[in-house]
Amino acid sequence: MKILIIEDEPSLREIMQRALVQERYVVETASTYSEADAKIAAYSYDCILLDIMLPDGNGLQLLKHLKELRKRENIIIISARDSLDDKILGLDMGADDYLPKPFHTAELL
């Protein structure tokens, strides 16, 4: 299974990547909206872990773009903004799940 982690916080990105690689997943990472957009255009993933707040864009806008491209990746939103409105909006836009930060890596697996 190939997973793309889109997360701007380096320490969290590394923790998630290590945990998933240890479980034998193939993992790629992106730290910005533009880097994520380029990887999504070039490759297919089984799952995308998507942060809402990115330095150069909004994760929900990226989710909308994915759906416009008719990408079929499973999408899990990860966000420090534990807002019910964000959760409902993300799920309504097509995300498969919403994981509020902070979380234990066991919740991710």
Predicted regions, residues:
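N-terminal/domain-start alpha-helical segments
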Residues: 1-109
